[in-house]
Amino acid sequence: MKTEIHIGNLIKEKLRQQERSNAWLARKLFMDSSNVSKMLKKQYIDTEILLRISLILEEDFFSYYSYLYNSTINSSSGKEK
């Protein structure tokens, strides 16, 4: 299954919308800002950290994966009919 979700980019976009910086997020996560910057360049992020980011930014980033999963399941079941 190929995914086109780049979770780091989605988080960066949400930070931009909220007019927040990587340094702000780093402080909230109790992480070094350079580590946060590196993390946001990645397509995948550890689920525990993603949960913390979701809570901090008040955005369910897991829903992007749920949507992709449901779309895949629905298109697969449509092919079997």
Where are these regions (language model features)?
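A short, Lys/Arg-rich alpha-helix, primarily the initiator
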Residues: 1-20
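Short, charged recognition helix plus adjacent turn
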Residues: 13, 19, 65-81
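Residues in the recognition helix of alpha-helical DNA-binding motifs
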Residues: 14, 28, 39, 67
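Core residues of bacterial helix-turn-helix
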Residues: 18, 29, 56-57
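Short alpha-helical "recognition helix" segments of helix-turn-helix
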Residues: 24-26
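Recognition helix of helix-turn-helix/homeodomain-like DNA-binding domains
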Residues: 30-45
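Short, basic-rich loop-to-helix N-cap that marks the start of a DNA-contacting helix
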Residues: 42-55
